């Protein structure tokens, strides 16, 4: 829940004033204002007071809805299941229960509930899409990608830690959002039940030890929310989301930038991207700082939260009119947490594209025919929410965020890396007649990649070579007193690191022995 504050809470600035009546008035008001954490307690209180069966069912559904909005999948499932057993006639209870089960990795059971929902509402594509999502998740978990991930317990806390960016161009410092103790103002959010988020920084030393995170300067952090940082290539300009008062004393979520001045961040400047009453957040800046992609629910979108793009002619120019990223990127669901890779590809999180559950991380590559969107699959993605990926320049290494089980807090930061694919060739050369080991044999490796190297077998008859990906190889073995022998191998079609083994037998050259009268 913490990670989407920038878009959800902004509704506070534009909601009309209304007076509600009845035992759920306070709960309904909290829910409408996005204060879902507060709404849970208020609805439970109202449920205990309610006498009418239908009213109690409605309240149970709203308790489940509130848990859904704070991403508490376990409690959401429990309350949806309760209201379904009571005969509540809203098909969405079945759909959202299936979503909650999928978010907990209960794929087989979730598939059954998606099928039940399709029976209740055959015209809604979300039922079949849920079944497809669960089937894909099961397949992807059975065939994980080569990415390795590690929880950054060095600076994660028991609270929510997310939204990370590099703060130095040598990647030795990071800035991230956190709702930990020590946040400016020390106030608890009615939306999340945690402290309002601030931006923190941490630095790694030469021994790989990370420093204790400390808040950024007070000129950046306020008593309310700051989060989702993005930095330029030189790491001397910071873009971030902030929740601040406008001139009419309304709380509005906007994007700000701050330039570094004498090693300190300067006065933040608001980016003029939308009217005052329109919430914008989650900035992603390109390396040249001429393109900015951000999140908004402004008019002209495709459903929930959409990705929008704005450009400018140079760094001193004003930003142009935002343009929606289009239906290849945006869906009827939510698209958030964009990141512009140095190679021009776009990474973002979505619960609208087919995924494993909750928010999944996607890579979008632009070609002549438009954008091609691919799921990052497992283990980058999980049944939980996975979001906010950043890369260490063009290296296959960086960070992302997740609320998957096994973390330290409600949202954690994870490091990921893609180990290089490594192929080795090894084998033993033996006497084909006696099976004796042959030392000192010449092994010549000739490859389609241009390789042409020779090595001699060790005293144990072994040889070793490093191989290139996607190449064919011939192996020629020679030794005095033996006939030459040949073999072949290939790395074509191999997608994971592997040690190939080719043992070779040399047959004694009996003709040569006969010349010397040896039998």
Task: List where the protein language model places each region.
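Short, conserved micro-motifs composed of acidic
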Residues: 73, 96, 103-428, 432-434, ...
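Short coil turns that delineate tetratricopeptide repeat
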Residues: 51-54, 88, 122
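Alpha-solenoid helical repeat scaffolds
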Residues: 24, 56-62, 91-96, 112, ...
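Short, acidic Ser/Thr/Gly-rich low-complexity loop/linker segments typical of extracellular
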Residues: 448-462
């Amino acid at each position: 829940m913490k990670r989407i504050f920038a878009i959800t809470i902004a509704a506070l600035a534009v909601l009309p004033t209304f007076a509600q009546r009845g035992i759920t008035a306070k709960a309904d008001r909290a829910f409408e204002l996005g204060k879902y954490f507060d709404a849970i307690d208020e609805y439970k209180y109202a449920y205990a007071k309610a006498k009418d069966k239908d009213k109690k069912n409605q309240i149970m559904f709203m308790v489940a809805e509130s848990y859904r909005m704070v991403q508490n999948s376990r409690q959401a499932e429990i309350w949806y299941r309760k209201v379904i057993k009571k005969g509540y006639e809203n098909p969405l209870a079945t759909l959202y229960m299936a979503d909650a089960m999928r978010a907990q990795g209960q794929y087989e059971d979730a598939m059954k509930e998606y099928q039940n929902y399709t029976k209740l509402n055959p015209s809604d594509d979300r039922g079949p899409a849920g079944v497809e999502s669960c089937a894909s998740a099961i397949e992807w978990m059975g065939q994980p990608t080569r990415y390795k991930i590690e929880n950054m317990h060095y600076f994660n806390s028991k609270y929510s830690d997310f939204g990370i960016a590099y703060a130095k161009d040598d990647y030795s410092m990071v800035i991230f959002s956190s709702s930990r103790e020590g946040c400016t103002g020390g106030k608890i959010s009615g939306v999340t039940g945690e402290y309002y988020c601030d931006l923190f920084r941490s630095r790694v030393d030469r021994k790989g030890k990370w420093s204790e995170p400390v808040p950024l300067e007070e000129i950046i952090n306020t008593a309310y929310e700051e989060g989702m940082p993005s930095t330029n290539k030189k790491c001397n300009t910071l873009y971030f989301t902030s929740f601040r008062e406008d001139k009419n004393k309304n709380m509005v979520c906007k994007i700000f930038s701050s330039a570094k001045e004498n090693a300190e961040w300067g006065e933040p400047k608001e980016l003029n991207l939308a009217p005052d009453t329109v919430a914008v957040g989650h900035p992603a800046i390109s390396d040249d700082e001429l393109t900015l992609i951000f999140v908004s629910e402004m008019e002209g979108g495709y459903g929930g939260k959409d990705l929008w793009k704005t450009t400018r002619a140079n760094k001193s120019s004003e930003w142009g009119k935002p343009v929606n990223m289009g239906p290849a990127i945006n869906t009827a669901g939510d698209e958030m947490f964009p990141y512009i890779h140095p190679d021009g590809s776009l990474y973002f999180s979505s619960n609208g594209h087919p995924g494993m559950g909750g928010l999944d991380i996607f890579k979008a590559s632009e070609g002549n025919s438009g954008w091609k969107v691919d799921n990052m699959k497992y283990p980058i993605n999980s049944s939980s929410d996975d979001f906010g990926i950043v890369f260490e320049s063009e290296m296959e290494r960086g960070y992302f965020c997740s609320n998957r089980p096994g973390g330290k807090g409600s949202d954690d930061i994870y490091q990921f890396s893609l180990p290089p694919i490594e192929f080795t060739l090894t084998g033993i050369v033996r006497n084909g007649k006696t099976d004796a080991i042959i030392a000192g044999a010449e092994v010549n490796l000739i490859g389609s990649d241009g390789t042409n190297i020779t090595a001699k077998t060790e005293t144990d008859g072994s040889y070793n070579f490093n191989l290139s990906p996607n190449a064919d190889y011939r192996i020629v073995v020679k030794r005095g007193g033996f006939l030459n022998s040949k073999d072949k191998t290939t790395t074509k079609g191999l997608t994971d690191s592997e040690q190939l083994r080719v043992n070779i037998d040399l047959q004694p050259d009996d003709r040569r022995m006969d010349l010397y009268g040896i039998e």
